Amino acid sequence: MSSLSRELVFLILQFLEEEKFKESVHRLEKESGFFFNTKYFDEKVLAGEWDDVETYLSGFTKVDDNRYSMKIFFEIRKQKYLEALDRQEKAKAVEILVQDLRVFSTFNEELYKEITQLLTLQNFRENEQLSKYGDTKTARGIMLGELKKLIEANPLFRDKLMFPTLRSSRLRTLINQSLNWQHQLCKNPRPNPDIKTLFTDHTCTLPNGPLAPSAVNQPVTTLTKPAAYPSLGPHVPFPPGPAAANAGALASWMAAASGASAVQAAVVTPALMPQPQNQMSILKRPRTPPATPGIVDYQNPDHELMKRLRPAPSVEEVTYPAPRQQAPWSLEDLPTKAALALHQGSTVTSMEFYPMQNTLLLVGSATGEITLWELAARERLVSRPFKIWDMSNCSHQFQALIAKETPISVTRVAWSPDGNFIGVAFTKHLIQLYAFSGPNDLRQHTEIDAHVGAVNDLAFANPNRQLCVITCGDDKLIKVWDVSGRKHFTFEGHDAPVYSICPHYKENIQFIFSTAIDGKIKAWLYDNLGSRVDYDAPGKWCTRMLYSADGTRLFSCGTSKDGDSFLVEWNESEGSIKRTYKEFQKKLAGVVQFDTSKNHFLAVGEDGQIKFWDMNNINVLTSTDAEGGLPALPHLRFNKDGNLLAVTTADNGFKILANPAGFRSLRAMETPASETMRTPVDFKAVPGAPVASVNCKVERGSPVRHSQMLNGVDPSKSRIDDSTDKPKSWQLAEILDPSQCFQATLPDTAGSSTKVVQLLYTNSGAGILALGSNGIQRLWKWVPNEQNPSGKATATVVPQHWQPNSGLLMTNDVSGVNLENAAPCIALSKNDSYVMSAAGGKVSLFNMMTFKVMTTFMPPPPASTFLAFHPQDNNVIAIGMEDSTIHIYNVRVDEVKSKLKGHQKRITGLAFSTALNILVSSGADAQICFWSIDTWEKRKSVAIQMPAGKAANGDTRVQFHVDQLRILVVHETQLAVFDASKMECIRQWIPQDSLSAPISSAVYACNSQLIYTTFRDGNIGVFDADSLRLRCRISPSAYLPQGNQGLSPLVVAAHPQDPNQFAVGLNDGSVKMMEPTEGEGKWGMIPPSEAINSPSTTSNQTPEQLQR
């Protein structure tokens, strides 16, 4: 429901309350679910009207929504049960036990049995835990206090506990204002209008005639724009307030936490409308979770901690979450079959799959070496032997160890969540961080002398929205560092060497679990207040903790000193073991290793085999010995999709186990050339063709992955000799015929007399918006149906050329504009509700539902040439101008806040990076400027390097990579990739060979793995985004009608969720959509590493060479 509809409900509630329609008020509260009336709820609870209490609650939550809801319903039904027992109504008590309380037996059978046993007592107060139960009135009051705390901590009640501050009779006031406005529109207004009905618009009758025609639907040209325009508001839901942290989520683990120091302040996404009063008022309630995330104890911390950790069951201990709904699965989903075996050369001690690519594996070994493997190609891409980068930064103690030639091994390798960094921990003092942007670009970043003795574990986390690395070691400490090597926290408290760490966040609480070799588990917040937990792990020795992929379930696995292994699931809310998995062998020397997969499976390496469990079943599901050769306690690691499992072998190597999907991913680079010729796409050899190297495949229809494309591998590095399955040759994909890809021409576009100069997909992926050179915007929408259930844009289903019933067009103001010289520009709001555009005249804000102009601003001169919404505030827009300035404009107050000067010619591109906190601008002067978002001061200006003989003019466009660190620069003479943090060009491609025409447009695919590039001769190139190597060429003959000379694409747009779909706008006004065929699934084949030796399209020329 839209925000205005929500506000209307509040106005109706106020009206009903003022008119004393009491039952109607509470019924609307319940049915809308917008406002939970605590006063009404209190009255019903204290009166013991339990049916009314549960009926009212049902409008806001159900028993199994979350653990807070479950606890609320449990407390109510428990009180109802106890009161029946107190009245000696045993039959009623049995009815409540069977009908109301039985649902909780699923989650805690022991507790249900204990409650049942109360029936056998003459007075339930004989039970020790209920001995202090007083009279009914007192018990209800105590319970009500607990319910209030649970309701305030429950995220489902957030923003529903305070009624917005309204003036009395606000709905009547609005109606009166509407009537006054209608009266002003009357052609013959009477001095004392007679208002007889609200069912129709008001008009004044003529003295001797019929009613004057209503003017309400006619354009009102005399009304001025409101001073405080609620920008982008009428159809936009209120953005959620900052999520408040709930203590209950980790009550047992962190009961003594301090809300003030728990985690960073919330990042408040600026509202699209002025902040509603209820969101401001609710922050003032002392019991309501605060706007800044923190730990909020809804009970006394010490009492809560003791209650949670005591071993005896309690009537208050039912907070088990409801079972998660899992997708159907079968044993075939498990990677149990050996797919390949690779030789590392020394004992493998740690492995980790790249988070963005299923077949890239990082391996650490006992010699201190790390290796990056591309599994599909069986390639050892990069190896880095252990080496001290800077001895002067190491402690004297470490230098003394090195002088004794003490061997050093890798204890842990890890990827940062975004895949931009690799962390390596060693058995002596050090950790090393590498910056990673592809196998050919693994750079030394930071070396830290982190601990005295071994660094036993390493993990990445993002406290305070800053990437950090967390380490633990033999010195009994846990430390938190930023990636530059600066230490932020040191956590002391363990009495033994710390074995492992598990950083996590839940309900905006960021924390770290740690385990020591004495079996103690501790939990830490990012503060200096000490550990929140001191608890024993099963086995009381080396234990590792892991969360399921979705972060909702916590597991630990370890071994005792006697060699007994334990795998358990924890009940976080209680600080107790929920499930202990069975069928381990006894007395194995060493520590058992485990991993989780797809929120459903657990895998453990034990007794020379891999055992698998369903998370919901304590018995082994299946096991495999991977065709033999495994050590007694193998290390193992799943890839992100769970279709590959890396397992260490006893012969200094590792095996890859796969399920059917895993085998397909491994064959992605192995398909023989003879088989590739059977695909619908015609592959032709192109001498010296530019290539890409490593495929980050995203299946059609899969969720978009925030990822990077890997560039070419280094041919000089050692490789595995077994290459019989490798492709014998690689050929550039060339699409020459319409049958070789899916394509569609959007309806009502062919033969138009105007050019498509701007093209966008809607953010939902269900529509395309085109801006013509005449200033008119057109919208196409896909609707869900049997052929297209998702309702997303696709080339296989014809969309609707969408227009509102009014027949309005989205037409920009072009009065007095020379359209030949205009630079039309467009920007879409994040929620697809509004589009802002200009075509040489004023900037217009259009409602995407009605096509009505909501407001106009920034009249020329100078004309607007580029528009970009601020990523953190839709009310702030960066507007590039014809006179080379950039205006930072606030729509809400209709004011230019800053004017940026740094270019010499008109602005042609703008892009924001929230990661770097900068705005990047480009102009027709071939200059790129970097501006601080905080101060709007210019940081640097860079000229793009022009090829020899080319003039530095023409439009330059910029777009950030999804990592927000690299930026694509597009000019008719080149594609270039800049490192925005250093403001330096790192890669460049110049039109050449079959793609020698000037570039007309280019854009990243949604996952930034590909770059779609259009050329003025009609060719389209699909490039690998990291290496700028050509993967596929689409000829004009594949998508343009024959005989249309001079027809070419002017602009390209990429689908926001499907990385393999794009659209192009042509100079005849038509819009074409393109997708690879189902059989192919992607644009072009990934070349084997040998193809890297062919001439590259990436320009390695120096700036001086370019200018010669």
Curated annotation (Swiss-Prot):
Residues 1091-1108 have a biased composition (Polar residues). It is found in: Nucleus. Keywords: Jasmonic acid signaling pathway, Nucleus, Phosphoprotein, Repeat, Repressor, Transcription, Transcription regulation, WD repeat. The modification Phosphoserine is found at residue 214. Residues 706-725, 1084-1108 are annotated as: Disordered. It comes from the Eukaryota. Residues 4-36 form the LisH domain. Residues 34-92 form the CTLH domain. Its main location: nucleus. It holds the Pfam family WD40. GO terms for biological process: regulation of DNA-templated transcription. The N-terminal TOPLESS domain (TPD) (1-209) binds directly to a 12-amino acid LxLxL EAR motif peptide. This is Topless-related protein 3. It comes from Arabidopsis thaliana.
